[in-house]
């Protein structure tokens, strides 16, 4: 349903070169969409090192990964090994507070600086057991 809505929005807004697909990120990053996206977005769904391994392979060189996080950024600092292995670099962190005292949030932006080694992304079970 979410993908249907996103494709409807793309159509209504007459966006060119934009489409929503329902895929597992690790499958898309292996072959289908590897190196094809200008921007990948994730919202507070997991550890940063795991999200990087799933998202960075989808990006073109100099593409941007936008990671919407909660208040706690401790896992961002521990993801430096993943950044190096995947040829990505943290470029910006935007901190803000939601209205009505809902809480503090962060947007962490990464750039893919070189092609991702072909060994990434690994199978999801491997990523979970042995994160970068």
Spell out what each predicted region is.
Residues 7-12, 76-86:
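Active-site-proximal loop->helix
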Residues 2, 72-75:
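Short gly/pro/ser/thr-enriched loop/turn and capping motifs at secondary-structure boundaries
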Residues 17-19, 64, 89-92:
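Conserved beta-strand segments of alpha/beta enzyme cores
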Residues 1-46, 52-55:
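Conserved SAM/SAH cofactor-binding pocket of Class I
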Residues 80-132:
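SAM/dcSAM-binding transferase cores
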Residues 44-45, 70, 114:
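Short glycine-/small-residue-rich Rossmann-like dinucleotide-binding loops
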Residues 68-72, 96:
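Short strand-turn motif at the edge of the Rossmann-like AdoMet-binding core
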Residues 59-61:
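Helix-to-beta-strand junctions that scaffold the AdoMet/dcAdoMet cofactor pocket
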């Amino acid at each position: 349903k979410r993908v249907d809505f996103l494709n409807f929005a793309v159509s209504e807004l007459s966006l060119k070169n934009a489409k929503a697909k329902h895929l597992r990120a690790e499958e898309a990053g292996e072959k289908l969409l590897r190196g094809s996206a200008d921007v990948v977005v994730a919202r507070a769904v997991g550890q940063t090192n795991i999200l990087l391994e799933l998202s960075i392979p989808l990006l073109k060189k100099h593409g941007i990964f936008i990671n919407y996080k909660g208040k706690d950024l401790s896992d961002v600092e521990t993801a430096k090994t993943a950044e190096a292995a995947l040829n990505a670099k943290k470029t910006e962190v935007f901190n803000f507070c939601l209205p009505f005292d809902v809480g503090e949030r962060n947007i962490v932006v990464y750039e893919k600086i070189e092609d991702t080694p072909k060994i990434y992304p690994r199978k999801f079970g491997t990523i979970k057991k042995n994160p970068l």
